[in-house]
Each structure stands twice: as C-alpha cells, then as structure tokens.
Amino acid sequence: MKMWGNAISVKTVKKVLFLGILILASFATNAQLIKDSKTLADMQIQLQKQQLLASGRSQQLFEVFKKPLSADEKQALEYLYAYMPLSDLADYDGDFFFQQTKATLTAKNEMPWGTQIPEDIFLHFVLPPRVNNENIDLFRVVMYPEIKTRIAGLNMHDAALEINHWCHEKVTYRGSDERTSSPLASIKTSFGRCGEESTLTVTALRTAGIPARQVYTPRWAHTDDNHAWVEVWIDGKWHFLGACEPDPELDMGWFAEPARRAMLVHTRAFGAYNGNEPVIEKQQCFAELNLIQNYAAAKPVFVKVTDTDNKLVKDANVEFQLYNYAEFYPIAKGKTDQNGISSIITGLGDLLIWAYQGDKWGYKKISVDKMDSVTINISDKHTTGITENFDFVPPVQKTPLPQSTSPKVAENNTKRLHAEDSIRTAYMATFKDSAWVAAFSAEQGLSAEKLLPIFRNSYGNWEEIAKFISGTSKSQKEWAVLMLEAISEKDLRDTKAEILNDHLANAFNYNNPASSQDKEFFAKYVMSGRIANEMMLPWRSFLQKQFGYEFVMQFKTDMNVLVAWIKSNIRIDNTSNLHSRAPLSPRGVFELKVADNRSRDIFFVAVCRSLGHAARINTATNLPQYYDGKDWKNIAFEPVTENITEKGFIRFVNSDINFDPKYAINFTIARYNKGVYRTVDFDYGMKLSEFEAKTEVEAGKYLLVTGNRQSDGSVLSSVTFFEVPTKLTTDINVVIRQDFTPIIPFGKINPSATKFIDYQTNNAIPLSNLISTKGCIMVWIDPDKEPTKHVMADIPAVKSLIENWSGGMVFLLAGNKVSSSFKPSNFPNLPKQSKFAFDKDSNLLLHIDKLRKTNSGSNFPVIAISDKNGNLLYYSEGYKIGIGEQIAKVIATLK
C-alpha cells in the first residue's frame, strides 16, 4: 500500500479549487437567508479553510453543491460547512447535511414565527443540527411532520411548552455513561441523562424553527455533579425550561434554585459569534458564552500571573477550579493577556485558581464574595509532603422565589405529566421480557441466562440485537454473545445489527483464539467495536481493505510500522473539533487524514483490532496501548519528557478505622504533567479498603485531594503533595477532615401522633412504629423528577449501614405526585426496613416547614431525620448528590 505523507496532491488541490469555485458562485445569487455583509465575508473565508481541511473527503462532502439547490439552501449549507467541527466533516456526507438544511428551511417558511427570528439567532441556534457531542441523526427529517401537527395553531411561547410535553412523552431521566445518545436513540430507549434530554429537547425545538440552546453548569458548587437544561428564545428574550420535565410556564424548573448557587452557567454558539452576551472562549467556529448573570449573583474576578522575578507572564494558562467529586475541576480556562491578567464573571462562592506555563505553576484559593482579584506567582519548585487545608464555601442558599402559577394550573400540568408517563410506559411495555428471551434463546440454541441481561439493557433496540444474533451462523453465535457482553450498555441500546455484524464477521481474518480465557480477552480487546466514548460504527471491514499484505506482515512483527504510518499520514488538529468534542470515527480519521489527539488514539486501537492485535485505551492514563503477549505497552505519539512506562506504587493508609473513604467521593489522587495535576481515573466509589495493598501507578509527582461535604454544601478539604519514585512504594495517609460541631435539634415532632398511610395496605402507620429504638429517616419524594431519582440512586450505596443501624426509613408520597407508572419495585436495593407511604395533605412536611419557618413548596426531595424521641436532627431539600453520605453521618450519632 502506498504510504503517502501530509502533502496534498495536485489532483486533490485542483478538485478542491474547482468545488470552491462552484460553491463560491452561490455568493452572487439572490439568497435572502444571510444578508449581513460581515457574516458573509467571514463565512467565505472559513469555507475556503474548511475545504482544504476536509480535502480528504471532498467528494463525500462537497459534491452536494452540484445538486439543483435553491439560493437559500446553498447559503445554509455553506454556513454549516464553514463552521462545522472535524467530527462532522469526517463522519457525515453532503446529502445528510442537505436533508438537515432542507428540513430547517421548511420549518422556517411554514412556522408563523419563521420571519420573526433575527438572522444571527437563526444561524447560531436554529440552523445547526449539532447541539453538543451527540451522534447527530436525521431527527428533523423524521420528526418534523409529527411536531408540526402537535403545535398547529399555537404561538411561539405555547409551542415551546408543548414541544417539551412531547419530549416528556418520549423520554424521562435516567443516568448513563458519558457518550451522548442521538435524539432518535434516546426516544428509542425511552430515557436519557440530563445532557441527552436537553439534546433531544433543543433538537425538537429547532426542528420547529424555534431558537434553542443547551445550557450547562459544568459543576455545581453546593453538591457534586453537574446539570444541563434548555434555553429557548421567545419574542426577543431567552427563557429556561427543564428538558423533558415540563412545567406550566417558562422560567420554571427544579434546578432554578440550585442555579442561583452556581459558579458558572454556559452554552456554545455555533459559528462566528458577534453577539452581546459575555464570552468565555471564542474560536473561529464557535464561542462559549457565560450566562451566569442570568441565574445567580455574580461578579468579575481578575487573576494576575507573575514569575519568580515578579514580572508579568503573558499567555499563561489559568484554570478556575471548583471542588466537586473530590477533585478540583476546571469549570473555565483562560490565558493571560499582555498585562498578565485573565478574568471571568463567576458566582459568589470559593474557587481554586491554578496558573501555569510550561513547567512553572502556582495556585491560590479565592472567596469571590470577598475578593475580586488575586496574584499568583508561578515557579517550577515542587515541595513534597506538604498538606494544606481549605474550606470551600458555595454561594449562600437564598429564600426560594415564589411560584408564578396558580395551584389549579399546576394541578392540570401534573395531570398532563401523568398522562404522558402512561404513554411512555405503554411504549416501554413493548420491550421484551424474560419469557420472550427464554423462547428466543431456545430457538437460537443459546443460554437464556446470558441473553436476558443483554436484551434487558437493549430496551427499544431489542429488534436490532435479535436481528444480529439470529443472522449469525451457528458456529459464531457464541462469539456474538461474547461480543455483546463486551460492549457498553449504551451500545446495546443504539447500535444497529449491521454495525455489530461488521465487527463479528471480520474479527477472525487475522486472529482466532482457542481457549475460553483467550476468547473473553479476544472479544473485549480485538473483536469489540467499543474503544472509548465514540459512537460505535462499522470501521473494521473498511480498515482491513486499506492496508495491504506487506504492511500487515510488517505490522505483526513491529508495532512501530503503524505508529510511523499514523504520524506520516494523519495530521493533528486539536482546535477544529473543540465545539463538538465528539471523537471522529476510525473510518472518518482515515478518510479525512486529520484528527485530534483523542481520535488519533482511538484510530490506532481500531487499526490494531482490525488487524487482529489486542489494543485498548488505558482508562487511567488515557494512553493507547497494545498487548505484546505478556503486558500492555504504551504508545506515545507526542514527545514526552519522562519515561511514562516507569512504575511505582502507592500504599493507601486509612487514618480512621471507623470510616472507609470512597474514591471520587471523599478522595482522589492527581498526577502532575506540564504544569497541572490531572485526576487518575480509578473506579468511582471504590472504597479505600478495596485498593490493592500496593497500587501500581505511573511514577511521578502527585496530589492527594480529600473532601468532606457538609449539609450546607461547604467542603472541608485538604491537598497533599507527594512523589512516587520508580519501582518504590510511597505510603499515603488518607485523612478526611471532620466537623466536630455537635448536632443541635431544630425542632421536635410527636412520633405517636404523627401518622402516615401505608402505600400497599392503605392502613395508618404511626411514626412511633417506624422509629424503633434508634430514630427514623423520612424522605419526601416526587418519583418522576430527576432530583428524587438521584437520591434514590444514592441511598443503596449506604444500604448495609442503614440496615445495621436498624432505625426506620420511610419514603413519603404526595397523592398528586404519583403517576400510574410508579412502583416501589422501580427502586431496588433500598434498605430492608424501607416503607412507602403517603403523608396525607403533607401534614408532617408542613409542620416541619413551620418549625423551620420556611416553605419547602415543591422542592423535592425533602429529607428529615429524627431520633427516637422525635427530635429533628437533619433537614435537606432539593437537588443534592451524595445524600447517602450525609445520612450516614447523622445516623452514626444515633446509637
């Protein structure tokens, strides 16, 4: 096979120039879509750059301009092409984008608000098919007729609300992995995490020609995790709404109060942004906008960076880091200007500011409500064994804003939600049960025990999984099951049969394992099409055809042959995919001959697997690796300043025999690299006692971060710098700081007089029957809302602790909060003493509100803990992650 270099051939250049002339001719047409001269000029410049960038796929992408397009269709396509990320240039073709454009312009022409939307708003927030890092699909083409019918006769405001109800019929909240499903895949599955719900809702709104954007707080300040929601542009103003969580009116949502405590809220604008909203980052093809002032009290913070001689440092990297999941997460990044200054508008809580340039670094904690500037001196000095304690305080919790709708309107909305739940539940009933799986397994001669979890996790994609298995030859059915077990749950939910078959049918061309142990290894690291967080696509047969016999023979004996080929043929561009952050497919990398580092690494693994060699991405280091028959070997495409293959060991020592800290909840470690520490990716929630006696890590400099989040959202944190020498063991004491302030009751209830109605029997239950001799945990829930689902997922993590405590636990429902789809069995693995009951007319909740002189309103879930005498010791309301940890702290005092 010819091993060409980075130079573009004369033939390719001529082809690109010809297509460029063809495309640019449209600028002289009578197009009315884009009239702003500055926008047109920038688009023309960017389009020429994109044509050269995408020259490897010029035919697939640009041949569409030879079609008989209308002037506006051409202009819309030109705008998309001018600013689209590498992932879209690599993995989609011109006809795909033409269909998107045609559907968008149809909506613009048919919807009554189409002519009311300003040009820039339309280009940034209606035309782009991509919302975030999802696999984009033909949702607009498929769903436009249904959505059009649904909103017929409505104004823009009411249409936006109605579309959110439509989305709720299709999808509800459930957590999942980091890969973002496409909108149609989420509908097929019937659920998605908040990032997927908001991607669906934004896409649905844009399908109707309504400007919409996905809005994120990258990390909360008062609790772990993040959240995404939607903003919709109505009659000249942006409003927010909860994706797939319809409220009676815009600017309502359970997240509205948490957002008032946020440190940053942001969104991305596609294209060259010249609007008036604050910009965090501006690139040629997108801008990241800072929306914090729309939600919370905020102010500018200025960071000055100096060197050891107190001279200003230009172009230093500045990260605004927030404690979350036991690490300091950069919610925003910037660079210093010629005056050594970087700034951001942020909420009024605490941040750790980290500045670095090359191997020089420094940091300081800042309390934004008390300070507006900080100077950080950077140096290359490292001091090990140093521990610093920091108290991180989030923005203060404020009195909830009053609800803007009447009780009657809220009640009617709740009835609609229950009806929509029923529609979705009816669809979910079409997913296959154990009886169907047993019959199918017998028909295929396979184990029902193995196939049951596969089909359960496939949800609405069960037909594709069944098609794949039934279409497999008898000799390969066992392999088909092994491969399905090796891919992710999300792959089972959205991968088509032909994609799975491409990997199975072409997996044995270069390798064929014998032993059962080898089979499992082979299925995971050779046969599987799942590598990292990319969309699984059919690249195996394609890649096998691209590399000739001579190359394959050389590759089998020398992995450097492939490394050299990639370095010579794949150009690295780490900026042109920033507004997508979706990895390019391996086939897309090969065709485009351009990739970011992550996609290049995935491509390396894909080629290895295609040619029968085990390979993976190491989840701890994110480096690509191949298996040499004995060990996993790193591949480093970038120059390194140290030997990354050298190892050392950490022995974690628990300083508290009564508490077993968990990774990414109570502590993390981060490894130093080029001026900054990045968290090592061990399993989330892994207990300290579960680590090996000596944990192998890359040798180098490290940072231990610990944290103890308090009930008010503040964190008692510490950082310890240490080093792991090559082949030596370093002992690290994991010390979780404690708050020894005694718990003071905030009120008292009468356990004998307080009664609930048992959900199952409808009989009255006195609270005194639940309290036993220890106390009771009371949790008021709204089962269909995301905050409650988080709490119900957190509590199983402390199940055994609550069971051993042996106090009472009751989950309390309000009659109007229970839909027909609710079942206690939907929440498995709760403590064995758990009961579900009704707090009639919210009597106890209202009494507790009176004791606290507050109104919890609809801010569910609400958690209250009493001792055996009815003294109320703990109270929490609203969205929080890790509530199980908070409960554990309180009941530990109730001996």
What residue spans do the PLM features occupy?
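Short, ordered, surface-exposed loop/turn motifs in non-cytosolic proteins
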Residues: 308-327, 348-350, 558, 657-681, ...
